């Protein structure tokens, strides 16, 4: 019920604290299945100071718009492109929808179809429904990467583009993006790479010597990439990113908003009003940590993943779904539903997929948290 009179700030705050006591918190060490993390303290400071900035009305916040452009350029550089075109958006879902919309609008096909792996994120289902694009699902190989031959067999005159995943939601698998890029070039189709998770992991992991295939704009067939700074980038939610290789993709989805300050403003994002502070936080975190800072974060996460995978193998009745590629470790057990329910009853925030449990080594996850989890897991599995 909407209150007749207001309430003291402290009283309201105390009520909020009471109502959210059921929430798991990142600092508890219990959240092991999330692809998000507690934001970096510096990013929180940026959000607080610039909370009023609205990138949906860039004529009012000209400086913030320029900073967003610089953030997009830095993300483009990270992804192998000197200058890209895009925006800091609400997350991977919006970014993926924008990519599909750009492909559809440029293709001009009456019955558009998009080919994507069966491992693709559910945001593409939303995109298909919203944009009237039929989704054509490609089969996976035994290692859970997309079957490139099956992708090729599904190409028709109605195909508007192809999707590859660089860090699948369930297993952290990276598709054979080089092969998909070659295929896209052969057929004159654009390739979108969903690197919502892998975008802030793979460049640094490769620099550390991990054997991961190329996935970004270094491959000529890649025309757009989704990358989420609010995951391993440690920027507060919401902060996703969509980067296009060429301006024509942004132009294809831009709508004129003539009444905004500054006059003829073109908007390409789904949201009108957009939090400028989050885009500024993306810029600030990249400036603050740099490549070496993020490489150190990824080093710890990858080493923790390798250690954790090894410890899982020591527990009878527990098995890896596959060796980890990124900082995601997924495993199965007998009586998985019972194990999952008991782990959750003990307070663990885990992500259960079809047939396995996913653990994500985000920056807030420490070895002592995992050691406690392993003790609980072994106890539950042994009955």
UniProtKB/Swiss-Prot annotation:
Alphabetized InterPro entries for the sequence: GrpII_AminoAcid_Decarb (IPR050477), MfnA (IPR020931), PyrdxlP-dep_de-COase (IPR002129), PyrdxlP-dep_Trfase (IPR015424), PyrdxlP-dep_Trfase_major (IPR015421), PyrdxlP-dep_Trfase_small (IPR015422), Pyridoxal-P_BS (IPR021115)
Gene responsible for this protein: mfnA
BP-aspect Gene Ontology terms: carboxylic acid metabolic process; coenzyme A biosynthetic process
SUPFAM superfamilies in the record: PLP-dependent transferases
Cofactor: pyridoxal 5'-phosphate
EC number: 4.1.1.11
NCBIfam families: tyr_de_CO2_Arch
Task performed by this protein: Catalyzes the decarboxylation of L-aspartate to produce beta-alanine.
This protein's pathway: Cofactor biosynthesis; coenzyme A biosynthesis
Catalyses which reaction(s): L-aspartate + H(+) = beta-alanine + CO2
N6-(pyridoxal phosphate)lysine sites (modified residues): 231
GO molecular function: aspartate 1-decarboxylase activity; pyridoxal phosphate binding
Family: Belongs to the group II decarboxylase family. MfnA subfamily.
Alphabetized UniProt keyword annotations: Decarboxylase, Lyase, Pyridoxal phosphate
Official protein name in the record: Probable L-aspartate decarboxylase
